[in-house]
């Protein structure tokens, strides 16, 4: 027998995951009352997990960093195989996790929340270092190494806009074509 929803105590991570989804889908609804409503709890639950709005804003940016960057990097570190194989794993993870949608939403939100700029800079640096390492492991050298790294980031950031309406099969075919493009010498 399940616990009634009203008696469940949500975790801080549940609040943050719901907030990130709202931010990506409908940023104008990123409000405490809307998050609480979607979680089926009162606003009081919010203040159990967050001291104030600033704590929430900072925590959401850090949650985004951890969920969409650090966890991906940690997964890559556990992968065996060639650098090309690891790049393919990275590309699949990014597509499956809606990473680009979350990234665009958080970056747009940062225009109104300047205190999250340091987290965004940290994420950018972590991602560039990781990609640079993968491409260097494939044997690419400067200046192509830097250009390939930055081009990958740009291409991936906007790719989801070009794949709207594609079947899963078509999306995977395009992913494979992009992978071949980025690993080609």
Predicted features by range, described:
Residues 18-25, 71-75, 106, 155-159:
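Solvent-exposed, amphipathic alpha-helical segments
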Residues 117, 121, 136-185:
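Hydrophobic/aromatic-rich alpha-helical bundle segments in the mid-to-C-terminal region
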Residues 32, 62-69:
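Short, basic, alpha-helical segments at the C-terminal edge of helix-turn-helix-like DNA-binding modules
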Residues 1-10:
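N-terminal intrinsically disordered/low-complexity leader segments
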Residues 59, 73-100, 148, 152:
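Hydrophobic alpha-helical connector segments
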Residues 97-118:
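Amphipathic alpha-helical segments used for helix-helix packing
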Residues 10, 14, 18-55, 59:
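Helix-turn-helix
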Residues 115, 119-133:
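Short, solvent-exposed amphipathic helices
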């Amino acid at each position: 027998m399940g616990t009634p929803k009203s008696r469940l105590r949500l975790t801080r991570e549940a609040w943050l995951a719901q907030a990130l989804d709202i931010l990506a889908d409908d940023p104008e609804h990123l409000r405490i009352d809307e998050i609480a409503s979607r979680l089926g709890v009162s606003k009081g639950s919010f203040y159990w997990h967050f001291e104030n709005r600033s704590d929430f804003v900072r925590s959401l940016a850090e949650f985004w960093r951890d969920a969409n960057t650090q966890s991906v990097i940690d997964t890559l570190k556990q992968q065996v195989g060639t650098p090309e194989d690891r790049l393919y794993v990275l590309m699949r993870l990014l597509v499956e996790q809606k990473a680009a949608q979350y990234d665009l939403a958080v970056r747009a939100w940062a225009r109104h929340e300047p205190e999250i700029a340091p987290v965004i800079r940290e994420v950018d640096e972590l991602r560039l270092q990781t990609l640079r390492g993968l491409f260097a492991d494939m044997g690419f050298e400067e200046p192509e190494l830097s250009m390939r790294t930055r081009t990958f980031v740009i291409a991936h950031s906007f790719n989801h806009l070009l794949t709207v309406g594609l079947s899963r099969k078509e999306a995977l075919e395009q992913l494979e074509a992009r992978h071949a493009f980025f690993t080609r010498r």
